[in-house]
């Protein structure tokens, strides 16, 4: 068997063993994908003992390419929500999550100085203590740029593996400590969250309103104050027994019935201006109007504003809702269409069929992966990650690297959505498959490289000390920020749990937080809010630590 064939066969064995280990559950908590690392360590220990030589170039390529696949697909997944998470509504959560990262860096520097821990080891412990694999990849890459030897990089992997188990357990312990310390009633916290955030729910509501305000008689629909702000869509108008699709220049009359779609608070505001809620039916059933959902798949309309399609003027069709990545939005004339958007249309059947030909509505395209944009994005990401940024006082240039470059490019491209006929939509199943393949390849190689000296380090070396350092790096930032968020920030307990899980980019912790109150979305919402920013910080922080401490 050739060296390359042997290396790939061993990697397959590591993946199978590691994924099996990851499925083990102890008190409902498992290692998940992290089990591949320990599968690699186990196999690596025996390959080293038996003198099995693996092709180093093959392993190095697989490790780096796996990391690129993982961070790129992460960026594509969270990109649409990344910039929205930085707006004012998420600033407090992102600030606390960033503080977790900052405190972790400070604790790591303190341990490095006080106990004289080797730099590759403290970087590995730092990454393992926060259960962040891209952080490990970024740390190993910057050490390579600084001229570290291969053996030093193996120490980084061992430090990661030693600190990783408590990294998972530590955040669960923190949630438990916070619950006891503040005598939290989880049901009450969930109820308070719903009350406080009920008006912020993203689900749209409908309201049938009769025009009773005489000042509105004869006005064009676009001139009605409550409807001109873009928060509400009027999808149907009933005058007498006749149901119409209203246009912006449609003149309304007293006693007309309007079917409005929008957020709850916006609908209430409109009701106060227009008139009163009525129990009358504005259903399209029994009329020549239809309600139909179409998917945007035609490259020609990607990036175009809804107003440019002239749907109301040409086809007498109105877009009442827009669903993007599972989130319902109020469509306005300035809304830009992206691949995969789901439009809720109201109009005559033949008109909707004409619009269907314009927007595409080819459902099979949603299951197809356009590979050209994937490699364009990866290529641009690698190029960006290779650009050196020289900062005064640093011994080497800082780079985004193979972890940061593809991530940043993916975030931007996913936010843009499409350029010409290239669109960066990826079906969730395809994204998950590529992401899992990437992280499995990366962890398998890291485990294999670390396995040779892992047992000896743990039993005869400094492994127990490293584990202790990892516990400190895990607990100090989490407990500090958890107490601050509750006492100073007055945050909901479930929101804090989701934020802490997001600050560690830890899916098992999110699963645990969701399990505290399965019907509440508080934890998942805060996790998603902080995840994109934290992932960027987790990738950049080991590089900055390495540059700061390399010459010290």
From Swiss-Prot:
Protein's UniProt keywords contain Cell membrane: yes
Recorded superkingdom: Bacteria
Membrane topology, from the record: Multi-pass membrane protein
A GO cellular component annotation in the UniProt record: plasma membrane
A biological process term (GO) from this entry: potassium ion transport
Annotated Pfam families: Asp-Al_Ex (PF06826), TrkA_C (PF02080)
Keywords: Cell membrane, Membrane, Repeat, Transmembrane, Transmembrane helix, Transport
Classification via PROSITE patterns: RCK_C
Domain RCK C-terminal stretches: 188-276, 279-361
Stored Gene3D superfamilies: Regulator of K+ conductance, C-terminal domain (3.30.70.1450)
One MF annotation (Gene Ontology) recorded for this entry: monoatomic cation transmembrane transporter activity
Membrane-traversing stretches: 4-24, 26-46, 65-85, 95-115, 158-178, 371-391, 394-414, 439-459, 464-484, 493-513, 532-552
Cellular location(s): Cell membrane
Main location: membrane
Membership in a protein family: Belongs to the AAE transporter (TC 2.A.81) family. YidE subfamily.
Name of this chain's protein: Putative transport protein PBPRA2144
Gene source species: Photobacterium profundum (strain SS9)
């Amino acid at each position: 068997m050739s060296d390359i064939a042997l290396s790939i066969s061993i990697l397959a064995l590591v993946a199978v063993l590691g994924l099996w280990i990851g499925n083990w559950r102890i008190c409902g908590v498992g290692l998940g994908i992290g089990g591949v690392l320990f599968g690699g360590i186990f196999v690596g220990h025996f390959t080293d003992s038996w003198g099995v030589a693996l092709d180093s170039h093959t392993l190095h390529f697989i490790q780096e390419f796996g990391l690129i696949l993982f961070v790129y697909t992460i960026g594509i997944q969270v990109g649409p929500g990344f910039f929205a998470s930085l707006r004012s509504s998420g600033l407090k959560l992102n600030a606390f999550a960033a503080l977790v990262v900052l405190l972790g860096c400070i604790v790591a520097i303190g341990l490095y100085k006080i106990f004289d821990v080797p730099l590759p080891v403290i970087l590995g412990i730092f990454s393992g203590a926060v259960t962040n694999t891209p952080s490990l990849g970024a740390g190993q890459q910057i050490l390579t740029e600084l001229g570290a030897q291969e053996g030093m990089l193996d120490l980084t992997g061992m430090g990661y593996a030693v600190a990783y188990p408590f990294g998972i357990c530590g955040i669960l312990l923190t949630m438990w400590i916070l619950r006891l310390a503040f005598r939290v009633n989880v049901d009450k916290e969930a109820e308070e969250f719903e009350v406080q955030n009920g008006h912020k729910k993203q689900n749209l509501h409908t309201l049938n309103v009769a025009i009773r305000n005489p000042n509105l008689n004869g006005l064009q629909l676009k001139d009605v104050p409550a409807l001109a702000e873009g928060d509400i869509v009027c999808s149907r108008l009933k005058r007498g027994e006749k149901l119409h699709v209203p246009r912006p220049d449609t003149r309304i009359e007293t006693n007309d019935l309007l079917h409005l779609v929008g957020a709850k608070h916006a609908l209430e505001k409109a009701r106060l201006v227009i008139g009163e809620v009525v129990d009358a039916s504005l259903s399209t059933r029994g009329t020549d109007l239809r309600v139909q959902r179409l998917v945007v798949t035609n490259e020609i309309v990607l990036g175009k504003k809804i107003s440019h399609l002239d749907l109301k003027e040409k086809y007498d069709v109105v877009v009442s809702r827009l669903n993007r990545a599972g989130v319902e939005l109020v469509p306005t004339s300035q809304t830009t269409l992206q691949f995969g958007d789901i439009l809720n249309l109201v109009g005559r059947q033949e008109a909707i069929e004409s619009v269907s030909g314009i927007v595409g509505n080819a459902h099979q395209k949603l299951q197809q992966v356009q590979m050209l944009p994937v490699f364009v994005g990866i290529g641009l990401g690698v190029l960006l990650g290779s650009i050196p940024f020289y900062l005064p006082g640093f011994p080497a240039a800082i780079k985004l690297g193979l972890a940061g470059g593809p991530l940043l490019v993916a975030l931007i491209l996913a936010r843009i959505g499409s350029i010409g006929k290239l669109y960066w939509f990826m079906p969730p199943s395809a994204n998950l498959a590529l992401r899992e393949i990437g992280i499995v390849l990366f962890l398998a190689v890291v485990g294999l490289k670390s396995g040779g000296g892992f047992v000896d380090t743990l039993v005869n070396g400094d492994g127990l000390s490293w584990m202790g350092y990892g516990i400190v790096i895990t607990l100090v930032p989490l407990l500090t920020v958890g107490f601050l968020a509750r006492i100073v920030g007055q945050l909901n307990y479930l929101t804090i749990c989701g934020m802490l899980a997001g600050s560690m980019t830890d899916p098992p912790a999110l699963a645990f937080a969701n399990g505290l109150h399965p019907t509440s979305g508080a934890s998942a919402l805060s996790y998603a809010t902080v995840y994109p920013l934290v992932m960027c910080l987790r990738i950049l922080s080991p590089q900055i630590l390495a540059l700061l401490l390399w010459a010290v």
